[in-house]
Regions:
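Acidic/aromatic-lined carbohydrate-recognition and catalytic surfaces
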Residues: 2-205, 209, 213, 225-234
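Receiver (REC) domain switch/active-site residues of two-component response regulators
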Residues: 217
Length: 239
């Protein structure tokens, strides 16, 4: 799937203003179905790189990449396990760096999706949380709340996820239910992170710096409206 946005006239490659994106022609690419360079039936970064001049000739100013990070890929790549590496189905980090260099050579800018509202259950932070008992420091990186009922066997409240069904999934430790549930506004494989925790802030600060260092020109922040201070939110109450 691809789509593009023509905001206004074409932006010149030498435009130095930080506001370049306001008038840019931005073309979105989901890598998986876009261009396959090696015949395995899956679009990849090298496939995009081979078509950069074509995109420039169309009048595109910038490419907005939907996630190409390592992850289970159960939600189109928006379930990220490693924000600083490329999923092997799309190529390698070296492929990404080569694509960015070539894009700049032909006058294109690169924007990538960053997903800071949640991680994948395969992210090292979440795996660390589930490998420790309730109340551990690792738990504090996510929204883990005691359930209702004598043993916490019921969800903390009646919140419904955007993908339907409860916005809570019960956790287990040593094979037994803990009575604690984690919040996921989207799929159960996408636990919401706690932006009040310094480890989360550091993780995404490092991620943005990592990609800026590799030449990325900007970011599209997924679920930006979800990045709010939740200290005052009663996660164990109903709407």
């Amino acid at each position: 799937m691809t789509n593009y946005t023509h905001v206004a006239g074409r932006v010149h490659a030498d435009q130095a203003s930080d506001d370049w994106w306001r008038e840019a022609v931005i073309y979105q690419i989901y890598p998986k179905p876009w261009a396959d360079s090696n015949g395995d039936g899956i679009g990849d970064l090298n496939g995009v790189r081979q078509n950069l001049e074509y995109l420039a000739e169309l009048g595109v100013d910038a490419i907005w990449f939907s996630p190409f990070f390592v992850g289970p890929q159960t939600d189109g790549g928006y379930d990220v396990a490693d924000y600083r590496d490329i999923d092997p189905m799309f190529g390698t980090l070296a492929d990404a760096e080569a694509l960015i260099r070539e894009a700049h050579r032909v006058g294109l800018k690169i924007i990538i999706d960053v997903v800071p509202n949640h991680t994948s259950v395969a992210h090292r932070f979440f795996k660390a949380a589930l490998s420790t008992p309730p109340g551990s420091p690792e738990w504090q990186r996510y929204h883990l709340v005691r359930g209702q009922g004598e043993h916490g066997e019921l969800p903390p409240n009646d919140w419904v996820s955007i993908f339907s069904g409860p916005a809570w999934t019960q956790t287990h430790f040593a094979g037994q239910p803990t009575g604690y549930w984690y919040l996921h506004i989207f799929d159960a494989g996408q636990p919401d992170v706690n932006w009040n925790h310094p480890d989360i802030v550091d993780e995404f600060d490092h991620t943005l710096r990592f990609w800026f260092d590799r030449g990325v020109d900007g970011f599209r922040i997924d679920v930006a409206h979800g990045l709010v201070d939740r200290k005052s939110t009663r996660l164990n109450s109903s709407h």
